Amino acid sequence: NESLSVILDLTKAWDEAQEQAETRSRMITGVTIVNNDFLAAHGDLVDTFLSEHEASIRFTSEDPDTASMLIEAAGIVPKAAVAKKALPGCNIAFLSGGEMKTALSGYLKALFDQNPASTGGALPDDAFYYTGAVSN
């Protein structure tokens, strides 16, 4: 629908709001969570999943034509053209290691500072973050 337009870029607004922050963060809209017991027993599978997830994100960025057709085929959106138009504004990214920890801890701190209940009343310690084998 050509009459639709973007009125607010949330990623840009977040970045602008973070310019003066003590700990800069990025807008985080999706994470992978793994139980510590599962990670200890199946770390190789977790690393394989993360590597394939990173490759999927790279593919989506590098080949939006094919990615949008797959998005339509999976029923995520009804038309590939809609997916292709939307992809550049989705801020799809893969972060791991220290980059992920910095971005996510800053994001959680920004939420906590506004309303501690939004993070369960506390900020997670270093054990919360998996900064293992996958690197981007």
Where are these regions (language model features)?
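Pocket-lining segment of extracytoplasmic ligand-binding domains
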Residues: N1-L70
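An extracytoplasmic/periplasmic, membrane-proximal ligand-sensing/linker region
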Residues: D65-N136
